[in-house]
Amino acid sequence: MPNKNMTNKLKYILYQFLTGTVGNFLVFLQPKKARRLAENRITLVHKNKKNLSVSERLMRAALVKKLDKIDDYNQIAELNRGFWINNATELFVETEDGFETDFLPNCTFIFDLLKDELGDQRAAFSTLVEIGTGNGDVLNYLSSEFPEVNRFVGIDLSPKQIELNKSKFNDNKKLEFVAADAFDWVTEHGHSNTIFVTSRGVLEYFLEERLQDFFKEIYRLGKSVFIAIEPNGGGHNFETSPHSQLYGNEPSFSHNYPRLFKNAGFTIWHFSQKPWLGGYDKQTFVGAKSF
């Protein structure tokens, strides 16, 4: 009987054959559909497989393999920023089940840890800011988990998504949604006694230097807590490679979050990692505080 490693290897070989041979053949036979699937690089990489037929999944995998390699960090940052301003809504629709299938079962534990970490100081925090709020589901959830917080602000680059969120959560008067660059908003409106949150892929689009400056700006506000739930490349070892690396097919940046928080003056009170959605990459959980 084949062992588990052999079985996984055979599955990998079969997958490579299907995507490399069958997928490419389907792309050749259906060029219009291929162009539609590949209209946007980031959407192609993240497209929800549940909404695709088997043939479309094979075509998608083959198309992802053909993506041009990008090494220019500034170009990557600009391309990703442009996407999140202009095209993000379609991706949020594609991945809208992620709140139920990923966030609730895999990520909420860190907010239970936050409650324990704050203890009697919970009432001192008057504002919670979610950077990269997306469809607003996480912010809405947090408003019920932290009833002592009076104000919940969701910031996103996409004006269209922000308008959708305002309509969707009109009945929750604690929620505010703002279309803005997070760095600019924090510089102008940030204050002490604030909890900052990112969830499952926001800070990965910052250049390392800008992210470091962003953490320093938040630290200067005064008393604050930061919960970062961010992906990292599966092969990124923070000890041997302390600086940011490219990862994935978008691509985006795998940052050494503990290092960047510490450099800004924060104390790390929680750090853990787990496989992200069962894949090679990792989901990193960081709890940092400025006091």
Task: Describe the role of every protein-language-model region.
Residues N193:
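Short acidic/histidine-rich motifs immediately flanking catalytic phosphotransfer sites
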Residues P2-H189, E209-D213, E217, V225-F291:
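Class I (Rossmann-like) S-adenosyl-L-methionine-dependent methyltransferase catalytic domain
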Residues V197-T198:
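A conserved beta-strand element that flanks and buttresses the S-adenosyl-L-methionine
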Residues V202:
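Hydrophobic adenine-recognition pocket in adenosine-nucleotide-binding enzymes
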Residues G222:
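Mobile active-site "lid"/loop adjacent to the S-adenosyl-L-methionine
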